[in-house]
Amino acid sequence: IQINDSFFKENLDLYKYAQSDIDKNKAFNQCMTFIKTLDNVIEKNNGFILSKTLSLADYAIFPFIRQFVNVDQNKFKDTNQKNIEDWYSIIHESSEFKYIMKKPNLS
């Protein structure tokens, strides 16, 4: 979580708000350093960050990975990070995620 909240978050912001394609690609590549490490951790731990089941660590990091993926979904898919893709889908499609992302009825 510490690496996510420092190195990854800093580069994620640079990637999201880059002023040039060169800056955006550089920030993307920096983010991919963390993404590849996370992909390996997820593989090692059988599908999630700490173990075989969802934990607070997964929920803490997911919003940042979601932001990264949403900048350019096709570019992310081209990286072939299968473990992260599966992990992402499980959380994104979960009833918990859908519940917290439900827009409130303000009328």
Regions of interest found by a model, annotated:
Residues 103-107:
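Long, charge-rich low-complexity segments
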Residues 72, 101-102:
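Short, flexible helix/strand-to-coil boundary loops that buttress conserved ligand/catalytic motifs
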